[in-house]
């Protein structure tokens, strides 16, 4: 009973103190927002003022001081914003931004930025003629390479190390030495059992299928008909007609007959040399045994 009496007296004495500090819900609504603002920082300013003795400026004053700008800086920012707004409202810029003219430059800028930052190492920047299309071969792993094309690619293009780029369709097996060999092949012309990597190209709705071959791998290297004679001309080096002409060098009949009719001692020798068809070069001494000497 005595405990309840003391509790009631304490509640009556504490009521005026609570109303003085925080105010009643009806009359102190404004002050409640001021001292206990809503949001994630509720009550933070009150604690800061209590800890610093009221010397810390309020959050509104800090924000106002931070937003003070220099006149020249404010003027420059205004000009930039005006230019940006005018550029966005320009129909020519909108058309250019949505067209294919700027897509290639954006892709090249992105690649150049990655290369400068060391994110991409160019393996062979000119493995294909730049007049045909532009692309980069970059390593994406230990045994993987990735081809980034910045322009639509022709149907079939190949570049062999030490040989110029050429259109391809068939050719003998070849061992790749040096840089990898890249094939640009349309989906309708895939004819080899190799892994095909589909590379999306900007400015083109048709994907490009790329074959990447590692150095030292034996592959079927297609060659175009216009380039095939350059690589497969056994006639120019082997020419059996020019080098294997036993008729011109081994004609023992003509020399042997003249030698046998003119001198009896030279006839048997010329016939003996002429009998060996496998050694036609030894028939040449026959003219020296002619009657003219």
From Swiss-Prot:
Keywords: Secreted, Signal. Residues 1-20 form the signal peptide. Its main location: secreted. Residues 235-293 are annotated as: Disordered. GO terms for molecular function: structural constituent of egg chorion. Pfam families: Chorion_3. It comes from the Eukaryota. It is found in: Secreted. InterPro entries: Chorion_S36/S28. One of its GO terms (biological process) is egg chorion assembly. GO terms for cellular component: egg chorion; extracellular region. Residues 235-253 have a biased composition (Polar residues). Chorion membrane (egg shell) protein; protects the egg from the environment. Belongs to the chorion protein S36 family. This is Chorion protein S36. The gene is Cp36.
